[in-house]
């Protein structure tokens, strides 16, 4: 259940975290990326910390709201948001799961990366060595190796290959081998996405294979971005993320259409710009603003659709 990421701040950071988290057994070494520090101006622009959503038994008075676990916005954002709770949907573009939880794709998902990109993961209790499992169990945990999201810590330290311990971290240079493994994984994931859900090896192939479903424009654009990431060269030690800032990762919904709101990643503690697009074509909706916040795209989309309907009636 990949991140469908609908409607939240888009950032290239979580995607790279996810992709690097697919390294499997051969990529357990750690690579550290430090988010740029937040300026006083960016922190001052943040809204007051949110409260936890009301519980199921909340009364009409609405006084049952309690402080939630605050985490940093997806990517390198500076403001605080509520962490996702156990059982809630999660993905690349959503706030991370609460302490002790991790975002996992559905166990039966053939495309765990795609599921997390679509926001179709679920916050579950962590199954790695830090929370009681043995190293052997970690190595054999298919879900963790193939699609688990690593955490984007509030203190700005982001561990790209899983784990949160501070001791024994390897320098970035030692992660280049793991990045090569990461490229192979992404390339293989890309191939699988193009096969339309072909059966795993070891199972009998059906006699008649259905033709793969046509890829939507948003899915095609996402495929192209993943392909570019898989072939990127990282010649220096500035960190993998700095090579991704120029890329725009499309925000697709679970049906493969563009989400109305598209956003650039957060950079240097400043929120990325957001704009509104047509869900079918990805083209800008005329008259909608491009702002560092919520442009309320549904209002402009409904207005556009209403105008088209009125024009059609006049033509008939």
Curated annotation (Swiss-Prot):
One BP annotation, GO: osteoblast differentiation
Official protein name in the record: Insulin-like growth factor-binding protein 2
Stretch list, region Disordered: 189-217
Domain called Thyroglobulin type-1: residue spans: 215-297
Classification via InterPro entries: Growth_fac_rcpt_cys_sf, IGFBP-2, IGFBP-like, IGFBP_1-6_chordata, Insulin_GF-bd_Cys-rich_CS, Thyroglobulin_1, Thyroglobulin_1_sf
Chief place of localization: secreted
Native species: Sus scrofa
Highest taxon in the source lineage: Eukaryota
